[in-house]
Amino acid sequence: MANGIASAIQPGDEIVLSIMEHHSNIVPWHFLRERYGAVLKWVDVDETGALDMAALEAALSNKTKMVAVTHMSNVLGTVTDAAEIARLARAVGAEVLLDGCQSGVHMDVDVQALDCDYYVLTGHKIYGPTGIGALYGKAEALARLRPFQGGGEMIEIVERERVTYNEA
C-alpha cells in the first residue's frame, strides 16, 4: 500500500499510525518517511487498551494523507472503532487503511459498514502460503494507486512513449 501511494506523497505529508501496529504496518510507512519526506504521527491507547480517539482526532490535519491502523490488535485483542476512525479521517480528506490480519479471521467484517478505503489481510492467517495476502479497496481508492512494479499480465500496451495498464 505504501508503495502504491508513494507517488502522491510530498514532503511534510502525514501518515497516522497507532502504537498498536504490527511492524508490517510500520516499516513500509517508514520507507515513505525516508524516501519522500512523509511525517509519521503516532496515536497511543487509553487506559483500557483502546485506541485513544481524542488523540487520533488531535493528530489529524489537512496534511494527513493516510490513517493506517489495525482493526484488531494482535497483542491486545482490541478492536478499533473503524467507522469512527473513517469519519474523523474523512473530515480532513485522509484515506483509511485497516490492517485486517486479525479481524479478518476472527470476526465478521463488513468493509462497507467500516467505510475504509482499503482493508488488507495476510494469507498465512487463513492457512495460505507466506508472502501472499488480500487487498480490498473502494473502486475510486484503487484507481488512485500507482503500479510500483511492472510486467506480465498487468500490461495492456507497451509503446516507445507510453505504457497502458490493464484494469485491476
PLM regions and their residue ranges:
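Pyridoxal 5′-phosphate
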Residues: 1-168
